[in-house]
Amino acid sequence: MWNMALLPGGIDACAIMPAMASLEKDAPAGAAAAAATPLALEFCGLKFASPIVLLSGCVGFGEEYTRIEGFSNRDAGAIVLKGTTGAARLGNPPHRVYETPAGMLNAIGLQNPGVDHVVRVILPQLDFSETRFIANVSGSTIEEYVEVTRRFDASPIDAIEINISCPNVKEGGVAFGNYPDMSAQVVAACRRVTNKPLITKLSPNQTDIRENARRCIEAGTDALAVINTIMGMAIDVEERRPVIGNVQGGLSGPAIKPIALLKVHQVYEVAGPHRIPIIGQGGITTARDALEFIIAGATAVGVGTALFYDPLVCRRINEGIAAYLAAHGLADVTELVGTLRTAKDLADCALSG
C-alpha cells in the first residue's frame, strides 16, 4: 500500500514507478542497480544503489532483519554492522533500552562477540552482492581501535566506520570524540593501517563539532557520519533510581532530528570544500526527513530507530525521495546535496542580480 503521507506535496506515485524498478527484491545489487536509478550515488568510491544507510546497532550484523517478510537489504545503499571491539563484551546491566517521547534511550554497552568472531564467522555469512557492508570499530584505547581496524582491513568489508564516542580509559574515561585532539589521534592511527574508506562518526556531545570535523579531515578520514546519539537519562520517580542500568544512555529518534540537522549543516560548511561526504543521521523516519538532511549537506542518510517500529521504512523513504526528484526535474539525488538556501545566499543573489 502506497503511503502518500511520505511523499512530499502529495506527488503521484505512478510518476516514480520506473525509477524504483531496480530496488525491487529480485533486482541486481551493486553497480548494475546503481546505474539504473536516480537514487544511486558514489560514496567514497563505493557504488550505493540508494542513499539510505542502516545504522550500527539497529540491524545486528546485517542479517537479523532479513527474516522479516518484505524486508530486503537491497533497499539500503549500505549497512553498518554492530559496533565491534577487540575482545568480546557482555555489555551493560539492564535496563538497556527505554522509550521516551519521540525517541528512545539506549545503553547497550557495545555487547559483541569480538572482532575475531565477526571476521571469521559472521562476515562469510553476509551476501555482499546485496548491498555494501561497513564495519563499526569501537575501542577503549587507541591501540584497540588500531587492532580492530587492522583486522577489518584484511576482510571483505567495504568500509570502516570509527565510533569515537567511546570512553578513553587512559584519560579517565572521557569520550575520544568530545575533544578534537583525541578524535584526530584515533583517526590518524586507524588511517595508517587501512586503505579502505574510513568514516568517522562524530559525537554531538562536544563544544564545536566543526572544529572536530576539520581535525578529523586533516587526520585522514574519508567521510563523516553526523551525528551519534545525544546523552540523556530517565528516572523512575517511585524508586528514585535511573531507569537505565548504566544511568545514562544515548537518545535517538525524532526528538533529536532538529539538532542533527543543524550539526549536518555545520559540518558541511567544513567538509563541503574538501569534498568529504557526510552520512546525515538522527531521527529520520520519512522521505521528507531524509530530503532535509540531503539538502543540508548529507550525501547519504542513516536510518536506525525507525526500523524498530517499521522494518519496511527504507522502501517507503526510497519511494518518497524518488518522487521528489521526479517532481522537481532532478536527474539524481546527488544534485540535491548541500542545496540549502540561507539568508546569506538569498542576499548574495539579490546583490548579483
Give residue spans per PLM region.
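Alpha/beta catalytic cores of nucleotide-metabolism and tRNA/nucleoside-modifying enzymes
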Residues: 2-4, 10, 17-36, 251-276, ...
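N-terminal capping/small domains of soluble enzymes
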Residues: 16-133, 139-140
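Short, surface-exposed connector motifs at secondary-structure boundaries
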Residues: 48-51, 127-133, 192-198, 270-275, ...
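Hydrophobic faces of well-ordered beta-strands that scaffold small-molecule active sites
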Residues: 52-55, 77-81, 133-137, 160-162, ...
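Flexible loop residues that form catalytic
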Residues: 57, 84, 165-167, 229, ...
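Conserved strand-to-helix beginnings and helix N-cap segments that scaffold or border functional pockets
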Residues: 65-66, 145-146, 210, 311-315
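Short, charged, surface-exposed secondary-structure boundary motifs
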Residues: 88-92, 234-236, 311-314
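Alpha/beta enzyme core
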Residues: 140-279, 288-292, 296
